[in-house]
Amino acid sequence: MKLFKLLTVLTLFGLAFVMIRPEQPIDFNSIYKVPSESPKSRKKWDAKRLLDANGNIPQSIRRKELKFAQSLPNDLNNSNLLWTAEGPYNVGGRTRALAYDVTDENTLIAGGASGGIWRSTNLGQSWSKMTKPFQLHNVTCLTQDTRPGKENIWYYGTGELAGNSASGGGAYFDGNGIYKSIDNGLSWDTISSFTSDNNAAGSFNVFDFAWNIVLDPTNLDEDEGYLATYGGIYRSIDGFNTLSLEIGGGDAYYNNVEITSTGVVYATLSSDGADKGFWRSADGMEWANIMPDSFGNTYGRTAIGINPSDENEIYFLTAETTNSGQFTNTFFNGETWTSLWKYTYLCGDGTDSCGTWVNLSQNIPANRPTTFDNFNAQGGYDLLVKVKPDEPNVVFIGGTNLWRSTDGFTSDTNTAQIGGYYEGSD
């Protein structure tokens, strides 16, 4: 039953792909990050529009704005109006975060890039919104503290950096640091240390753009966790009240972090940063770059898939590996390169002969009857790799479609499309 519910969560996570229909396709090509884009420049441009007479953005102005908005319905005497939701009900939006409660697998918590936190206690049959109207709704990552006695604690990161608009990749959503719940997801508050309320005008807060957040289940004495943001990977030992930069410090745009059940940390930074590559650490402080020499020089966002039945095996699925990996033609007359590698840790720090790599990129679905049938991560906008807990050869990869391989993508003959566009769409 536990395995079934785990797979149900995986299936729900893939629903963002399932409901896509090609009759009126959205052009996501404009979402792709181009070299001229700069979050820092956009931040300064926004600041010029929002400065007060003294040349400052008033402290906590966004929070005050939302609080003021709460009073508007009362002032307009609309409190007696009754509203009924009329739909649509079959559109999940951009769900960046989803997890089930380890103490009750019927309880699911999901987070949307512009829709806030939602909670279900009946395995997704119905949902309740937990984010308050005066809070920012830009949820991008979510994690639960699974240590005994700590399961009521959850964290989520904020800020959609990949773009949340069908018409422009520059339309990213700023977040406001990290949020924490101590009542199993029923209510949430910001961790004030890293909110952007006190930012100087035009300043850039990397904690406004979180890619992923994970906790160390083995550290019983400290609240140890890791956060992947724009620019780098951060570590905390006090529940994200303070953070230290472990890798990065430059302009790496797409970054990720995952952790094994034994506390081994894997991180990835895109090629536009100084500390680019794939990294491994046994303690979160000493890091080794384990990236294979033949990987290629250009790469964007990477999804990390740890094999639960053998955590020495990790899959890395990377988007926009220009001139390296698998080439595919995509809809809207586009084209892309994607790479899939499998890493096996053997000894020591995992580098050189202490780790082996297998390039599985040639088995990524390509050259299908129509471009909608080919693998397409849309520049990393949608990217997923997961391993089935009790069958390590069953591996899932997701882009605009969701694919299932029964031989770990060691061939292209044992792969089936299980979600996304209707096969044969044109």
Predicted segments, located by residue:
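Extracellular glycan-interacting surfaces
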Residues: 4-426
